[in-house]
Amino acid sequence: NMAEFIVAIELGSSKITGIAGKKNLDGSISVLAVVKEDATQCIRKGVVYNIDKTGQCLTSIINKLRKQLKYEISQVYVGVGGQSIRSVRNVIVKDLPTDTIITSDMINELMDANRNMTYPDQEILDAATQEYKVDNQYSLDPVGIKASRLEGNFLNILWRKAFYDNLNNSFEKSGISIAEMYLAPLALADAVLSEAEKRGGCVLVDFGADTTTVSVYYKNILRHLAVIPLGGNNITKDIASLQMEEKDAEAMKLKYGSAFTENNDIDNTLKYSIDAERSVDSRKFIEIVEARINEIVENVWYQVPSEYADKLLGGIILTGGGMNLKNIERCMRNTTHIDKIRKANFVTHTISSSNAD
């Protein structure tokens, strides 16, 4: 029964992941199979640029899932993230005859008007209502209030139309139909953030290979979403500039890399070995890694809108491959001065029952 099986494909900055799950009676999902394909040939910074290769990649993932499930897959959910997305604020104002009582129809009209906004080369993928302003009072639920002016504040999540077209073409080439597209960062937030964190205010930082995604929540509402075109691969490339291949640089990053080292703990005579013959100065290595991770963390903090910077009772939640860098919490604290930082470990974060209904 197809309804029981759910297949999601998530396009990351360095890999495409296919996840097959079975829906349980309580709405939860049991993950049955996970397949990952290297996507460096077809996706750059989360944007499809080679349609044929992406199509081949998708076909390969679907075939592997079919083999594991022994089941025919005809449609998939697609998680979108990466640099094709960004968020913008929008305000819609409606002047009303004096003492009009606001109805839910008026609210729906406001939301529709927001959804019908056009942006050059971009499409609205999702919209989060921030708040309403009734005359001069802010309200989250203004229905039933008398007013002569109603204003809606929205956060629109946009993505590039070209990206959408390329993605559709890639799926057409693989012969799979898209059941629904969803925003990977929102699905991730649903999976890893607690209600208390979203309510009290928090920043979710997803450190990817080529991109870092920042989501800000307050009072249970998404307030900002941004994708920074920097990630773990930038650190690797910087290490490689010390005259070594990227695979060696990646191995050294995992072995020696640290986001923060006390100056007194740096031994000027210590060398880190690349292989049997070659080594690099530990100080140089430490400085290179720190410079880049500091740049990424500063960019992350810069993305947090100033009106929410002091409303983060839930703190900062780190996820993605880059969170495994040693002392990453210390580095974040140095820049943000926020003490509450936790790492969210998860295996497959994609499918939550809200996407599967």
Give residue ranges: language-model regions.
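Glycine-rich phosphate-binding loop of actin/hexokinase-like ATP-binding domains
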Residues: 200-241
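Extended, folded domain segments that form the structural surfaces/walls around functional sites
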Residues: 10, 206, 295, 302, ...
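Nucleotide/phosphate-binding catalytic cleft detector across ATP-hydrolyzing
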Residues: 1-15, 19-204, 221-223, 232, ...
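Short hydrophobic/aromatic-enriched beta-strand-loop microsegments
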Residues: 224-226, 337-344
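Glycine-rich phosphate-binding/hydrolytic loop that grips phosphoryl groups
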Residues: 342-357
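Glycine-rich phosphate-binding loops at beta-strand->alpha-helix junctions
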Residues: 81, 159, 258-260, 311-335
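Short glycine/serine/threonine-rich phosphate/pyrophosphate-binding segments
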Residues: 16, 210-215, 325-326
